[in-house]
Amino acid sequence: MKITILSLFPSIITPFFENSIMKKVVDKGIISYEVISIRDFSKDKHKRCDDVPYGGGAGMVLKVQPIVDALEYVNANSKTTIFVSPSGLKYTQKLAYDLSKKDELVIICGRYEGLDQRVIDLYVDLEISVGDYVLSSGEVAALVIIDSVYRLLDGVINPNSLCEESFSFECGLLEYPHYTRPYEFRNLKVPDVLLSGHHEEIKKWRLVKSVEKTKKNRFDLYLKYLEMRGEKNDGFDKKN
């Protein structure tokens, strides 16, 4: 897979590819990347890439010309082009899986109040929001997408590990609690079942804890889990 990122601040993006697991993935050739500075394509003598919005309003808007020129430079029409935006589709694990099947991604990092709509009309295949909150940097949102996608590629993470994720797409539950040595710390002990050696009992315990955590922290996922199993809500709200 090749990932191309268009950004006003490439120095935020580049270190991500040069450290930890991602560096190994790049070195193995599983992923290649290119970080494009939008400013390099600005025709303004001061390399400005934003301007005031038509119709008035607060803030500045990213101009169409530098971004379209950058997109044409990377031949974005032949690739899946994403704009990270609070107005986009809510990002999910399923969408991460879908994106991991693409050969090439182009990600436009937003800034300021937004992006000239004509860029979206001409080039963007997907607008994606990473959550119901506001970020000052589209680069942060882009890294969320990249991180969630690359780990799904063949050869990055052991398939058995992917089956026991913090969020399991397959079963729709949050992950169970984890413990390691020491057995006791400040009077808190590891649950005995985890030391029992009875794998079926351990599996049952983990499922129960996953359901409990999902009900407490993500009641929406808990309801989907019940629906998937053909069960109904037990009548308790998420505070119970």
Swiss-Prot record:
Q: Name one GO cellular component term.
A: cytosol
GO MF, one term, reads: tRNA (guanine(37)-N1)-methyltransferase activity
What's the EC number here?
Answer: 2.1.1.228
Reaction(s) catalysed (UniProt annotation)? guanosine(37) in tRNA + S-adenosyl-L-methionine = N(1)-methylguanosine(37) in tRNA + S-adenosyl-L-homocysteine + H(+)
Record-linked InterPro entries: Alpha/beta_knot_MTases (IPR029028), tRNA_m1G_MeTrfase_C_sf (IPR023148), tRNA_m1G_MeTrfase_TrmD (IPR002649), tRNA_m1G_MTases_N (IPR029026), tRNA_MeTrfase_TRMD/TRM10 (IPR016009)
Location relative to the cell: Cytoplasm
Ordered alphabetically, the record's keywords are: Cytoplasm, Methyltransferase, S-adenosyl-L-methionine, Transferase, tRNA processing
Q: What class of enzyme is it?
A: transferase
Return one Gene Ontology term, BP aspect: tRNA N1-guanine methylation
Task: Indicate which residues the UniProt annotation says bind S-adenosyl-L-methionine.
Answer: 110, 130-135
Residue intervals passing through the bilayer: none
Described function: Specifically methylates guanosine-37 in various tRNAs.
HAMAP family under this entry?
TrmD
Quaternary structure (record): Homodimer.
State the family it belongs to. Belongs to the RNA methyltransferase TrmD family.
The name under which this protein is listed is tRNA (guanine-N(1)-)-methyltransferase
